[in-house]
């Protein structure tokens, strides 16, 4: 019998959301994504101690550079076991500084360049703030492709598409978490607010012929993944990938480009900064989850820096 994972791979590019090389190798995804939380987990793994030490040794005491060197080293190892791309994230504390985001992105891609990794195998991850989207717009024009993450609202998705970013990562599970806590309802199937958000974005992009790739992220259960089967890409934790690999039930495709036009309901165009900020202000869930996500990644970045700083002693 064919597993649901193999069925999913027929119409969706499957991406592993992990820095675990062994798990990636066994599950055979096309791409992989990392973030500060996953890098912190990798840095705490004794198997990566040598890599962590080398990142510090080559940084001349610059802890921020050491973190970037470690992120790129993890990315290099991942690229040995995936045929596609790896996403490497910029320090979340820079999320509201366009110029700083551009500079840090250029440093990351420069480290990949120095390691002999072609740019078409790397996506630079930025939080989908207004400043992050503007940075991505500039980077894309300069040949550096981006992945806009921590995306919780339709306004973020529209702004990203209009900026010509390569890929967005709209979150499913964190949206579900917020609504479940807010309403007390345990949403399932197509009623899941996270599923509805990604479906709306996917349909809008296809109906308007936007080329930006939609990669659903942050899943809490298999049903959320199944409801988005057919999305351009889905980045999935190793635990859920393993469950998909073990399930031999039938998987039905839910999202298709040819049906998207029938469900088009929004025609927002040329979103201005004031419109973007107002839409964000009016969406309590998106405002709270974006801020929370940036804070969480910033704290994990600080913990990673502390690990590297300890090597100075």
From Swiss-Prot:
Pfam families: TAL_FSA (PF00923). GO terms for cellular component: cytosol. It is an enzyme of class 2 (transferase). Its EC number is 2.2.1.2. Disulfide bonds: none annotated. It catalyses: D-sedoheptulose 7-phosphate + D-glyceraldehyde 3-phosphate = D-erythrose 4-phosphate + beta-D-fructose 6-phosphate. It is found in: Cytoplasm. GO terms for molecular function: transaldolase activity. Keywords: Cytoplasm, Pentose shunt, Schiff base, Transferase. GO terms for biological process: carbohydrate metabolic process; pentose-phosphate shunt. Homodimer. NCBIfam families: PRK12346.1, talAB. Transaldolase is important for the balance of metabolites in the pentose-phosphate pathway. This is Transaldolase. It comes from Pseudomonas syringae pv. syringae (strain B728a).
């Amino acid at each position: 019998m064919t597993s649901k994972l193999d069925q999913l791979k027929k119409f969706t590019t499957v991406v592993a959301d992990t820095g675990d090389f062994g798990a990636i190798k066994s599950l055979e995804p096309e791409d992989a994504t990392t973030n500060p939380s996953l890098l912190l987990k990798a840095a705490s793994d004794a198997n990566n101690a040598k890599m962590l030490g080398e990142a510090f040794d080559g940084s001349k005491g610059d802890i921020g550079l050491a973190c970037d060197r470690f992120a790129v080293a993890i990315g290099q190892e991942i690229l040995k076991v995936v045929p596609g791309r790896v996403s490497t994230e910029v320090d979340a504390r820079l999320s509201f500084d366009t110029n700083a985001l551009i500079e840090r992105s250029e440093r990351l891609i420069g480290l990949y360049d120095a390691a002999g990794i072609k740019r078409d195998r790397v996506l630079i991850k930025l939080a989908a703030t207004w400043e992050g989207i503007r940075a991505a717009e500039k980077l894309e024009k300069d040949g550096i492709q981006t992945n806009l993450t921590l995306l919780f609202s339709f306004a973020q998705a529209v702004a990203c598409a209009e900026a010509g970013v390569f890929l967005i990562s709209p979150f499913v599970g964190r949206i579900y978490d917020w609504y479940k806590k807010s309403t007390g309802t345990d949403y399932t199937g197509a009623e899941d607010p996270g599923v509805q958000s990604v479906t709306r974005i996917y349909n809008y992009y296809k109906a308007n012929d936007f080329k930006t790739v939609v990669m659903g992220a942050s899943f809490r259960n298999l049903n959320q993944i199944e409801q988005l089967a057919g999305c351009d890409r889905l980045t999935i934790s190793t635990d859920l990938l393993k469950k998909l690999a073990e399930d031999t039930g039938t998987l039905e495709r839910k999202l298709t480009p040819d049906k998207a036009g029938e469900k088009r309901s929004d025609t927002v165009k040329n979103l201005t900064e004031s419109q973007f900020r107002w839409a964000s202000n009016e969406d309590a869930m998106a405002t709270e989850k974006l801020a929370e996500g940036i804070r969480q990644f910033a704290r994990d970045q600080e913990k990673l820096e502390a690990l590297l700083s300890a090597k100075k002693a």
